[in-house]
A protein has these predicted regions:
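Second-shell loop/turn segments in exported
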Residues: 5-8, 38-62, 110-119, 173-177, ...
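Short, small/polar residue-rich loop motifs at catalytic or cofactor-binding pockets
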Residues: 6, 11-15, 198, 252-256, ...
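Juxtamembrane extramembrane loops of integral membrane proteins
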Residues: 10-78
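Soluble non-cytosolic domains of exported or imported proteins
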Residues: 14, 60-67, 118-122, 180-184, ...
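Beta-lactam-recognizing serine transpeptidase/beta-lactamase-like catalytic domain environment
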Residues: 28, 34, 206-220, 265-354, ...
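Small/polar-residue-rich segments within soluble enzyme cores
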Residues: 64, 68-72, 97-225, 562, ...
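Conserved, well-ordered alpha-helix/loop/beta-strand core segments that scaffold catalytic motifs
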Residues: 113, 213-257
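Ligand-recognition elements built from short beta-strands and adjacent flexible loops
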Residues: 511, 547-550, 564, 594-763
Length: 763
C-alpha cells in the first residue's frame, strides 16, 4: 500500500528593493546571509551513549571532540572569507565569545536545533560546509571507534539589510527589524513597495516527510520588491550633515539640530538631517552618542525625567517638594527614541522671527500693507496687560515693512498683526499649512498641532503669533510655508522619493510636484522675495552672515524662546536658533533651513550669529554644486585681500570668507576642533589672491601642512585645476584656458604648503 501523503509548502523569500539617491548611489541594499545551525542530537561524534534496561538513552559529551569541532568552526566564522584561518587572533575577546557560543550550543546533545552564528557571508558558509563534509568523510572511515561518527551542521538562507554609509541620512532612510520589516523612515513608509511578495513551492511528501519522487512540485515565484530613487542627493546631504555637526559642537546645542534643503517649486527634498543620529546597520546601539544623550535627558527633565519612587510607586520629593531624578534609572529607551527621531517632522518648536516672513505675506496679500507701510517702534508696546519689547529693548522708530523685517522688529509686527485681525490671520495661517501635516512621504510626522483658532486669538495671542512666539510648528512646516511665500504663492507637498523602479530599473511611478493650493498672489510673492533679499543684502543686512558672495540670497533669522520648557540655569528661557534662506532671490530654486534647539553659546543667543552662518556655509558649497544661478556679476580677474582670521572662531572665519568670495577648508588633523579659534591660516592675512581662492584654516597648530605638487603638464586647464584642488592647492590659469598646460609655477613633486597658489600656463 502506498503511504499516505500530504502537501508541503516551502516559502521563497522576495528580495527587498534597494534605495538610491538622485544620482543612483546605493543607500540601502539587501544581501544574502546565512544562519549556521547544528543538530547536536544527530552529531554522534560529540558524545557517547548508553541505553538502560528501560530503554532510556544517556548521552555523555566528549569535551575534547566538542572543543576540536568548536575551534574549527569558530576559526572559519571569524575568518571573514573562510580561508584566512591563521589570521584569526585566538586570544581576542571576539574569538573567546564566539568559541564559547559554539561550544555551549554543541554541548546540548539532546537538542535538534541550535544556532551557532547569524549573518554569515557565503564564503564562510561554503568553508564550513567543506569542513563538515571532509570531517564526516574522514570520521566515517575511522578505525578508532572513539573517532567514529558525524557532526550535523547546516545553514539557512536569509537576507540582511545594508546601509553602506552608516549613519548617513539615517533619519530619512530609517531601518528594518530582525524580520526585515521596515520599522522607521522610508523603510517603514514604503514597506509594501520595498518588500515585494514572497513566493512558495508546494511539494507532495510521504508520511515521514520525504519528497515523493514522481510528484511534480508547483512553484509560485517570488516578486522582488521595487526600488526607491530619492530626490535626496548624497553630495548635498554630506555638506548639510557636515556643517550641522560642526554647528552642534561649536554652539553646545543641547537638544539636537536639523537642516533641510528643498526645491521650493516641487517640494523635492535634496537633503534632510537630524543630528546626532544613529547607524541603521545597528539602530539599537547608542554608545556613540551616550555622553550627549546623558546630558540631554538630564538637561530636559520635563521631557525625559525618570523620578525616584518608593515601594508603593509614589514619587519621592525633597524638602522643598520637588521631585528627585533617579540617576540609576534605565534611560536606554529614551536614548534610542531620541536618536531615531527625525527632528524635522516629529517635534514642534516656536519659529520666532522666521515667521515674520509669513506675517508680511498676510499683510501684503490681504491688501492691508505693502513693503513701504510704516509703523512706529518705541522699543516697548503694551497689549492688554502684556508689555512687548524688541531685542535689547531697542527702539527702531518709524520704519517700513522691508526695514522691519531686516531689523526683526517685534513691535512693528505686533501692530501689523493687529491690522490684519484674528480671522484673516488665522485664514492665512491655515492656508500656509500650519494646521495640518505637510504630507511628506515619511512616517511619524506629528499629528499634534499647537496654535490658536480665530475665535481663540485674543489680543495677546494675536500679538505673540504675529512674530512667531505663540504657535508651535515643525521645521518642515516652516520650510514649506516659506517656499510658498517665494515660489509664486503655491503650497507644495514635500517629498523624498522621486520615483519607484522595478528590479530591472524600469520606472513604475514618478513623483512630481504636488501643489496643494495657491496661498498668496504672484505679486505678493515677488514682494516677499524683495524684502527677504533686503534682509541678507550683500553681506550688510540683518541676515548678512548667511551671505555668500556671487549669489542673490533672501533670508530670515528666528530666535525663539521655548516657553513650554524649564528655564536655563541663568534663569532665561531656552532658545531655538533658526534661519531660512532662499536662492536665487529673484527666482528661488531652493530653500536652505537650519534649526538649532537650545544652543549654549557663551557669547550670543541670536540666530543671526548661530544659525545664519551654518546656512551660509551650506550655500557656499551646495549652490555651485547644483549650478544655482549667480548674481551675474563677472568677477574673473578680481583680486581679494585675505583677512586675518587667526584668533577668530572657525564659524566666524567661514562667514568672513563667504562674504569676500573666498572658499574655506578646515585642514585635516587629528584634533581639529570646529569650536576652537583659528591658530594658523594659509594663504596668510594680507595676501592678494584671486576671487574664489580656498583659504586653509587650522585650529590646533601654528604651522601649515605641506602637500606634494602633482604633474599637470599636458592636462586640460579644467582637469589640472581639479588635480591641484584635490592636492589642497589653489590654481591660477594664464594663457588660453581652453588649451592644455604647458608649464606650472611649481615643479611636480615639490613640497609646498596646502593652499599655495600654483599658476599654470596654458596654450
Amino acid at each position: 500500500m502506498r503511504p499516505s501523503s500530504s502537501c508541503w509548502t516551502a516559502p521563497i523569500q522576495a528580495t527587498r528593493g534597494e534605495i538610491y539617491d538622485a544620482s543612483g548611489i546605493t543607500l540601502a541594499s539587501t544581501s544574502v546571509v546565512w544562519t549556521i545551525w547544528a543538530d547536536p542530537s544527530y552529531s554522534s561524534i560529540l558524545y557517547t551513549s548508553q541505553t538502560a534496561a528501560d530503554g532510556t538513552v544517556t548521552k555523555t559529551l566528549d569535551p575534547a571532540m566538542c572543543a576540536e569541532v568548536s575551534r574549527e568552526l569558530t576559526l572559519r566564522l571569524l575568518s571573514g572569507d573562510g580561508e584566512s584561518l591563521d589570521a584569526v587572533d585566538t586570544s581576542s575577546d571576539a574569538y573567546q565569545q564566539q568559541y564559547q557560543t559554539v561550544y555551549d550550543a554543541l554541548s546540548k546533545t539532546d537538542a535538534a536545533y541550535v544556532t551557532l552564528a547569524t549573518k554569515v557571508n557565503n564564503a564562510v558558509k561554503l568553508s564550513i560546509e567543506q569542513y563538515v563534509t571532509a570531517f564526516n568523510k574522514a570520521h566515517k572511515k575511522a578505525t578508532d571507534t572513539s573517532r567514529k561518527g558525524r557532526i550535523s551542521v547546516s545553514s539557512e538562507k536569509s537576507f540582511q539589510r545594508n546601509y553602506p554609509y552608516g549613519a548617513f541620512a539615517a533619519a530619512v532612510l530609517g531601518f528594518t527589524d530582525a524580520d526585515g520589516v521596515g520599522t522607521y523612515g522610508l523603510e517603514k513608509s514604503y514597506q509594501s513597495t520595498l518588500a515585494g511578495v514572497d513566493g512558495r513551492t508546494i511539494t507532495q511528501r510521504n508520511a515521514v516527510g520525504n519528497a515523493i519522487a514522481d510528484a511534480n512540485a508547483t512553484t509560485f515565484a517570488a516578486k522582488d520588491g521595487s526600488n526607491l530613487v530619492l530626490s535626496l542627493d548624497v553630495n548635498v546631504q554630506e555638506i548639510v550633515e557636515r556643517y550641522l555637526n560642526e554647528a552642534i559642537a561649536a554652539n553646545t546645542v543641547e537638544n539636537r539640530g536639523t537642516a533641510i534643503v528643498m526645491n521650493v517649486k516641487t517640494g523635492a527634498i535634496l537633503a534632510m538631517a537630524s543630528k546626532p543620529d544613529f547607524d541603521p546597520n545597528d539602530p539599537l546601539d547608542y554608545s556613540a552618542n551616550l555622553d550627549y544623550l546623558n546630558e540631554l535627558v538630564r538637561a530636559e527633565p520635563e521631557l525625559y525625567g525618570i523620578y525616584k519612587k518608593d515601594a508603593d510607586g509614589n514619587e519621592i520629593k525633597d524638602e522643598n517638594g520637588n521631585r528627585i531624578l533617579d540617576e540609576e534609572a534605565d534611560y536606554s529607551g529614551y536614548f534610542r527614541d531620541i536618536q531615531w527621531k527625525n527632528k524635522a517632522i516629529t517635534e514642534l518648536y516656536y519659529p520666532g522671527s522666521v515667521f515674520k516672513v509669513i506675517t508680511s505675506a498676510m499683510g501684503i496679500d490681504s491688501g492691508l500693507a505693502n513693503i513701504n507701510t510704516t509703523f512706529t517702534c518705541a522699543g516697548a508696546y503694551g497689549v492688554a496687560k502684556e508689555t512687548y519689547h524688541c531685542a535689547g529693548h531697542k527702539a527702531h522708530g518709524t520704519i517700513t515693512l522691508a526695514e522691519a523685517l531686516r531689523q526683526s522688529c517685534n513691535i512693528y509686527y505686533i501692530q501689523l498683526g493687529q491690522r490684519i485681525g484674528s480671522q484673516t490671520f488665522y485664514d492665512y495661517f491655515d492656508a500656509f499649512g500650519f494646521t495640518s501635516r505637510t504630507g511628506v512621504d515619511l512616517p511619524s510626522e506629528t499629528n499634534f498641532m499647537q496654535y490658536y483658532k480665530a475665535d481663540q486669538l485674543g489680543e495677546v495671542q494675536l500679538a505673540s503669533s504675529a512674530f512667531g512666539q505663540a504657535m508651535a510648528i515643525t521645521p518642515l512646516q516652516m520650510c514649506t510655508a516659506v517656499a510658498a511665500a517665494v515660489n509664486g504663492g503655491y503650497l507644495v507637498t514635500p517629498h523624498v522619493v522621486d520615483k519607484i523602479t522595478d528590479s530591472n530599473g524600469n520606472v513604475i511611478e514618478e513623483v512630481g510636484a504636488n501643489v496643494r493650493r495657491q496661498v498668496i498672489s504672484a505679486s505678493t510673492s515677488d514682494a516677499i522675495r524683495q524684502i527677504m533679499e533686503y534682509e541678507v543684502g550683500n553681506g550688510t543686512g540683518g541676515g548678512k552672515y548667511a551671505y555668500v558672495s556671487g549669489y542673490r540670497i533672501g533670508g530670515k533669522s528666528g530666535t525663539s524662546e521655548q516657553l513650554n520648557m524649564d528655564r536655563r540655569t541663568d534663569g532665561d528661557y531656552k532658545k531655538v536658533a533658526s534661519f531660512a534662506a532662499v536662492l536665487p532671490a529673484d527666482d528661488p530654486e531652493i530653500i536652505v533651513y537650519v534649526m538649532l534647539d537650545d544652543p549654549n553659546n557663551a557669547k550670543t543667543d541670536y540666530s543671526s550669529l548661530l544659525a545664519a552662518p551654518v546656512v551660509g556655509n551650506i550655500i557656499s558649497e551646495v549652490a555651485p554644486y547644483l549650478g544655482i544661478a549667480t548674481d551675474g556679476e563677472d568677477r574673473s580677474g578680481t583680486t581679494v585681500t585675505v583677512p586675518n582670521l587667526v584668533g577668530t572662531e572657525w564659524s566666524s572665519a567661514q562667514v568672513q570668507l563667504n562674504i569676500k568670495g573666498l572658499k574655506h577648508q578646515l585642514a585635516e588633523s587629528e584634533s581639529s576642533q570646529t569650536a576652537a579659534a583659528v591658530t594658523y591660516q594659509y594663504p596668510h592675512a594680507g595676501a592678494k589672491v584671486a576671487y574664489g581662492t580656498t583659504v586653509y584654516l587650522y585650529t590646533d597648530t601654528y604651522e601649515g601642512q605641506h602637500t606634494e605638487v602633482p604633474d599637470v603638464t599636458g592636462k586640460s586647464a579644467d582637469f589640472a585645476r581639479q588635480m591641484l584642488s584635490a592636492a589642497g592647492l589653489n590654481c591660477v590659469v594664464e594663457g588660453d584656458a581652453n588649451g592644455t598646460v604647458q608649464a606650472q609655477s611649481e615643479d611636480a613633486g615639490a613640497s609646498v604648503q596646502r593652499g599655495s597658489i600654483i599658476t599654470i600656463t596654458c596654450g
